[in-house]
Amino acid sequence: MRPPAQARWEGQGPTAPLRLRSGARWGRGRPHCWVYVRVRVTIGYHLDRDDSGGMATTSAASDSACSAAPPPVGGAQAAAAVEEEEREVVRVRVKKCESFLSPEFRSFAVDPQITSLDVLQHILIRAFDLNGKKNFGISYLARDRLGQETFLSLLSDWDLSTAFATASKPYLQLRVDIRPSEDSPLLEDWDIISPKDVIGSDVLLAEKRSSLTTAALPFTQSILSQVGRTLSKVQQVLSWSYGEDVKPFKPPLSDAEFHTYLNHEGQLSRPEELRLRIYHGGVEPSLRKVVWRYLLNVYPDGLTGRERMDYMKRKSREYEQLKSEWAQRVNPEDLEFIRSTVLKDVLRTDRAHPYYAGPEDGPHLRALHDLLTTYAVTHPQVSYCQGMSDLASPILAVMDHEGHAFVCFCGIMKRLAANFHPDGRAMATKFAHLKLLLRHADPDFYQYLQEAGADDLFFCYRWLLLELKREFAFDDALRMLEVTWSSLPPDPPEHEVELVGPPSQVADTGFGSHRGRPVRQRHMLRPAGGGGGAFEDAVVHLAASSQGPSGGGRLLRQASLDGLQQLRDNMGLRKDHLVQLSHPATLISSKSLSEPLLNSPDPLLSTSSRPDSPSSSSPPSTQEASPSGDIAVGSPLMQEVGSPRDPGKPVPPPPPMGLPPPQEFGRGNPFMLFLCLAILLEHRDHIMRNGLDYNELAMHFDRLVRKHHLGRVLRRAKALFADYLQSEVWDSEEGAEATAPS
């Protein structure tokens, strides 16, 4: 009996798809035969890695053939063998992304005919050692109908077959995103639940406290708390002088060191010292998930580790409930308007970062959209304003959990909601204080800006509104934010973080509405004389109010650069003064919301437009802006800003004046002002040497978006902040009371 012309056996394993093939040829009436066996082994992964960011190109596939008297093969058979070889091998390149850790790369080859999604997952687990991180997503690089590259999720064997068929030439590019699950111990593995976890921590307590005292940088909340503390106690930690900026930063707070700030029950026992430590060097990326909740005042005081875990789970369930109530809280028209407005900003927020890369309907972008929509629906007095997506984006990326991120976002918005109020008072105060600080720190530079017509500092609007989030690369911005938050005093909620805001008050919004139907208005500041489209795309005011079933109004505002006009009004800028500073503008209003929401691709990103140069002239406007007396601090600056000057006369040097105390300065966030000052001073010489006018100066800083050097800015800001705290040049009755001996 003759054997078959070709025998074939296939075996399948989790990491090594295997195919063996044997063939035999028999000659009629001839006593000899030849048999050949071809063995192909495809190993599931290749351990070479390319840490520089490139893909390793060496394949782990190997072929071996053993033959005894191989059969003759013709040219057609050879071509068929090559074609079959191409069908049997798909080269794969994989990039693993895990939070903010450096990406890892692997390269291997698989047989598409016998490689299922389950087999591929086993290969990736072995390749990247993912045994403890089973919750990960796989996506492959493909091209959409327009030819744009995008990552598509691999959710089934059918998806994998499609990837092999359409996206494997010359190789299949995969991305693995690690996502810890909600109940994974990775979320809270640094929370102490058992006392045995902190054995020996008391031994380190005295040593840690001593080292913090001797090397401490200025710490704001030591002043802000005002509970039985005097300035002399604050000065005990001010051991770093202005000239010592060459000292390196302390290393980021580690997991082990964080445990020393907790007691035997896992409660945070030294919140002030923890913030001071973070002010020194930031937090390790793997620790941010928990530490940021303290910095954003999410946890009530005194929670143990187990109580914190239960608290976050409960608040997450509360968020999911609120998310399901959108339709009950707003009418369909307003809800659709809110969602579309939020979506336009979400789709352009941090898309270059791996966490938000991928298709527009990706899970992270969808989570950011739902988070912001829920906030707008549940906080009608604030609603949604452009820029909020920039504040929520880093929080969601760090928490990697939609519900937890929403709780933290509510925590930070408790402090920053005033930035987005339509009356512009909060932003006007911050501008006034930054102007006062620059005038105090560098009179010559301030005088130069006055002569250039740039002393209003409106090109810094994005800095103050978003607390400099866009001025640094994403990872640097995370560190800058946590250092800034650590300079603020602890303010834990008395009971829990409130996830629902007060109802809307239409009378307080400053916008009218027609009875019985929504009224939406769009306001733009445009130059009176065609000076380059001053605020044409950069300043958009959008309002929407409607009467809901309960009779309460609802307001949605877009593009917070609209606050520039309110800032001018609140800061007492008269129109004749605006003309001399080349700020002629007319207000164009009552445009329908059916028009595009934003003309600029990213209004907050560009503030370089200016109506005219300082040398141009415009007829004075007859329309007066009513000044506001709402700024409580820095009245000398307000008097100086509100009065016109003769452009032909030299600007006299400003007289020395004090600065507000920390609890008032920058509306309670003074360190943010010093960061802004540090950025200005970093570029002072370049600006003055090249004689930049307002437009050139604003464009200069627009080009530096996400490019500022965090190390230099932090060192300079901390040194200036130390001088401020030591100088006691505080001009406020409250400040005088705070510095009085107790």
From Swiss-Prot:
<dbReference type="InterPro" id="IPR000195">
    <property type="entry name" value="Rab-GAP-TBC_dom"/>
</dbReference>
<dbReference type="GO" id="GO:0006914">
    <property type="term" value="P:autophagy"/>
</dbReference>
<feature type="region of interest" description="Disordered">
    <location>
        <begin position="592"/>
        <end position="664"/>
    </location>
</feature>
<keyword id="KW-0968">Cytoplasmic vesicle</keyword>
<dbReference type="InterPro" id="IPR035969">
    <property type="entry name" value="Rab-GAP_TBC_sf"/>
</dbReference>
<keyword id="KW-0597">Phosphoprotein</keyword>
<keyword id="KW-0963">Cytoplasm</keyword>
<feature type="compositionally biased region" description="Low complexity">
    <location>
        <begin position="600"/>
        <end position="628"/>
    </location>
</feature>
<feature type="region of interest" description="Disordered">
    <location>
        <begin position="1"/>
        <end position="22"/>
    </location>
</feature>
<dbReference type="GO" id="GO:0031410">
    <property type="term" value="C:cytoplasmic vesicle"/>
</dbReference>
<keyword id="KW-0072">Autophagy</keyword>
<dbReference type="GO" id="GO:1901096">
    <property type="term" value="P:regulation of autophagosome maturation"/>
</dbReference>
<feature type="modified residue" description="Phosphoserine">
    <location>
        <position position="194"/>
    </location>
</feature>
<feature type="compositionally biased region" description="Pro residues">
    <location>
        <begin position="649"/>
        <end position="663"/>
    </location>
</feature>
<dbReference type="Pfam" id="PF00566">
    <property type="entry name" value="RabGAP-TBC"/>
</dbReference>
<protein>
    <recommendedName>
        <fullName>TBC1 domain family member 25</fullName>
    </recommendedName>
</protein>
<dbReference type="GO" id="GO:0005096">
    <property type="term" value="F:GTPase activator activity"/>
</dbReference>
<feature type="domain" description="Rab-GAP TBC">
    <location>
        <begin position="282"/>
        <end position="488"/>
    </location>
</feature>
<comment type="function">
    <text>Acts as a GTPase-activating protein specific for RAB33B. Involved in the regulation of autophagosome maturation, the process in which autophagosomes fuse with endosomes and lysosomes.</text>
</comment>
<feature type="modified residue" description="Phosphothreonine">
    <location>
        <position position="214"/>
    </location>
</feature>
<comment type="subunit">
    <text>Interacts (via N-terminus) with MAP1LC3B, GABARAP and GABARAPL2.</text>
</comment>
<feature type="modified residue" description="Phosphoserine">
    <location>
        <position position="560"/>
    </location>
</feature>
<keyword id="KW-0343">GTPase activation</keyword>
<dbReference type="GO" id="GO:0005776">
    <property type="term" value="C:autophagosome"/>
</dbReference>
